[in-house]
């Protein structure tokens, strides 16, 4: 994964954290599960252990 893509994914993950933390979307039943899924995917993708296992 290129450095630029990693940085974009990290910024996106920070944005998801901020949206969750702010509570602005807490009442939106459609967006909340999508953000949770996006957060999970980004964390898995950016996890060093996941990336190490893919490389080997």
UniProtKB/Swiss-Prot annotation:
- Pfam families (UniProt xref): Protein_K
Question: InterPro entries, per this entry?
Answer: Phage_phiX174_GpK (IPR020962)
**Protein task:** Somehow affects phage production, although the protein does not seem to be essential.
What else is on record for this protein? Answer: Gene K overlaps genes B, A, and C.
Regarding protein family, the annotation reads:
Belongs to the microvirus K protein family.
Q: What is this protein called?
A: Protein K
Q: What is the lineage of its organism?
A: Viruses, Monodnaviria, Sangervirae, Phixviricota, Malgrandaviricetes
């Amino acid at each position: 994964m290129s450095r630029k893509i990693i940085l974009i994914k990290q910024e996106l993950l920070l944005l998801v954290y901020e949206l969750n933390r702010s509570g602005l979307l807490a009442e939106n039943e459609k967006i909340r599960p999508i953000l949770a899924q996006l957060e999970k995917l980004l964390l898995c993708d950016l996890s060093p252990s996941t990336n190490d296992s893919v490389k080997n």
